[in-house]
Every structure is written in structure tokens, then in C-alpha cells.
Amino acid sequence: EISACLVGSEMCIRDSGNLVAIITMFFIFAMISFVTNLAAPFGTIWRNEYAGSNTLGMMGNMMNFLAYLFMGIPAGNMLVKIGYKKTALIAMAVGFLGLFTQYLSSLFGAGAEVFAFGEYVIKLNFVIYLLGAFICGFCVCMLNTVVNPMLNLLGGGGNKGNQLIQTGGALNSLSGTLTPLFVGALIGTVTSSTAMSDVAPLLFVAMGVFVAAFIIISFVAIPEPHLQKGGVKKEKFSHSPWSFRHTLLGVIGIFIYVGIEIGIPGTLNFYLADSSDKGAGIMMNGAAIGGAIAAIYWLLMLVGRTASSAISGKVSSRAQLIAVSATAIIFVLIAIFTPKDVTVSMPGYTVGEGFMMAQVPVSALFLVLCGLCTSVMWGGIFNLAVEGLGKYTAQASGIFMMMVVGGGVLPLIQQSISDSVGYMASYWLIIAALAYLLFYGLVGCKNVNKDIPVE
């Protein structure tokens, strides 16, 4: 029997049918990663279309995450007004629309010039693609808002709730592993003729998955404990999450963390797919190899989350955050200072040859290893930032969801740097970001506002 109890309430849900709801939430967790991780490998196509501009190549990722800034708090309000199930159904419909819009970019607008962006002339098909990525961002924001509190509720909160979230996170990482692998395999080598139509089969599969998910969720009974009853007045608090220093610094930490998580593999993918002198020097199947190696990063995030869930009962979130931040700094420094001609064999994948070993710079290996470190950062920052918030926790959750926009902003800045001074030099931005997380774990996470009543 699976039970879930509301914190601060005598209401308790006990229903073996919750197993179906849990499996459904796991499925949604995987979908979040699938949609999010389409942006970076798709970016290799647009990057090539615009003369190797890494900044424009990362714009799809930026639009995907920009949606969080607009949808973070409204998505939380939707849970209260219409419940988990309807919010999830709306998210699935929006996700289908976003993917379909991206597919339309392969059919229309390739010859229609819209406006100039520096030295580049932006075509209508790129604008359509960015619109689709933005719409998909609304989808994943709503799904994120549903899945985390729902799994915590179904697990009864506490360690069991966290265990379900960690399991969902593992499936999220598995999905993130497969997505760049599939896209890279479909693209192969990026050439002047490579277009969105080459990845249309994956978009069709994704749209089909959203339709199937919509149908499944329609028939699944999901508990709605937070659904607001008519006539309930919204409680007004004397303070806000911003009143707590450790929460404010944690909000900044979430913004930075998501940028790190996306920026490391995203830039690495571009680096390996770039056959010019700026790139890694891989002349054949660069996009496929880059996608496969980026997939290893997400696979290591799966390993890291699994390991973290096993030790979290004995090792504090603070200790984990300090350890992984320091380790990641070392890995990235090694990657920056190791010459490109120092290589190592790593597994790749192409449609024609299947799995194979590819020679890549050693830098790629150390950047991939960062996946072990980034895997536990979200949970660590979140737990430390909401510690001692009490009744302000729900408000803080909405703010954290908005700060996921960092996954679009920081990688875009990193690509701008890479356009100017090179791929490896752009990782100094990642070093600075990791240094902030190390500071947060050492000093910034301490609650210095315990005088504020939270009950």
C-alpha cells in the first residue's frame, strides 16, 4: 500500500491505485528531459545554417528556458485553481503544439528573410523554430511544477517523498541520455545541406508520445489535495521568501546551476560537431559523436543521482554540494588547460556504423565527468534554500521555477564568449559559476534570519 500525507494536515491519502499515478509522474519526469534536451543538438543544425554562429545555435535553448521566467508562478497558480491532472493535460497539449511548430520550421520560411542580426540575415524558418522552442518551454515548466510536489505527496513527504523524486530524476537523466544520442545519430555529420527535416522522424515520435501521454493521464485518477475550494481566501504573510538571505542566495544558485548543467554539455556538443579549426578536429560524424558524448554526460547524471539517493541519509546536502562543486571546478580547469591534440577514445554512435570508439580531446572526458557533479546540485541547493522557510516554502518554489531561466541565459552568454575567444576559454564562465555554488555551500546557505516567524 502506498500512502501520502499532507504536511500540517490530518488528511491522508491511502490508495493502492496511487501506483498508477506514481508511474505516470515518472513518465512525465522523463518527458521533461526529452523536450528540454532536443534544443542543444538541434542547435548544431541552426549553427551551421548561420555560418557557425554558436550564439544563434543556442537560441533555441534560450527560448526554451525563457518560458520559465513567464510561466514559473502562473504554473503554480494553475495547480491551486485547476489541479495536477488538468495542468498536466494542458502541458501535454502545449508540448504537442510546440513540437509541431518546430516541425513546421522544416517546411516553411527557408527563403523568407525577416530581419538582420549583426552580420546574419534571420530567415522565417528560424523564427518559427524559436517560437516552437518557446512554446515547448511553457510545457516543460508546467510539467516540472506538477511532477515534483506530486511525487513528494505520493511518497508521503520526507525521505520517501525524496526517494520518489530521486527515482523520477533518474528516469529524467536516462531520457536526457538518449535524446542527444538519437538526434546526433539522425544528423550524422553537419553539412551545408543539413536541415530540420533530417530530424523530423524524432519530432513525429515526440508528438506521438505527447498524444499517448495525454490519453493515459486522462484516464488516471490523480489526488488533488492542493485544489483550492471555492470561497477560500488567500492568506497574507508579513514577510516573503526574499526576506531570508539563504533563500535569496539559493535563488541565485538555482539560476546559476541550471546554466552550468546545460552549458557544459551544450557547448561540448557544439565543440565536437565543429569541423573547423575552432572545433575538436573531428572531420566525420562530428554531430553524431558529439551527441553520443553529450549523452554520456546525462548518463553520468543518472549515476550521480542514484549514488546520491543511496548516501543522502548519511551525507548532508551541504556536504554533497561543497564536494561536487569543488570537484567540478577541478575537472573544468583540467579541460581548459589540456591541449586539443591530447586525445582519448570514447564511445560514439552513427546510424551507419552503430556504436564505435572515437578519438576526442581529453577535455571532452573531463567535461563529461562533470555530469557526476551536477547531478546532485539541484537537490542540494533547493534543500538548503528552503530550510527553515515553513509557510513561505510554496512561494519560494514558484520563484525557483522562474530561475530555471538560467539554463537559457548562461549557455547563451557562454556561446557568445566561444564565438569571440574559443570553446575552451568559454568554460571560464562555468568556473565562475561553480565558484559561486561552492561559496553558497560553505557560507551562503546558513540561515541568518531565524527571528522571522515561519509557522
Regions inferred by a protein language model and the residue ranges of each:
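Short, small-residue-biased leader/transition segments that mark boundaries at the very start
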Residues: 1-13
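Extracytoplasmic
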Residues: 20-52, 144-148, 264-272
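Extracytoplasmic gate region of multi-pass secondary transporters
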Residues: 39-40, 243-295
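Central cavity-lining transmembrane alpha-helices of secondary-active solute carriers
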Residues: 59-77, 295-307, 406
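C-terminal ends and interior cores of transmembrane alpha-helices
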Residues: 93-121, 327-356
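Intracellular juxtamembrane helix-capping segments at the cytosolic ends
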Residues: 142-156, 375-390
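Helix-loop-helix hairpin linking two adjacent transmembrane segments in secondary transporters
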Residues: 161-221
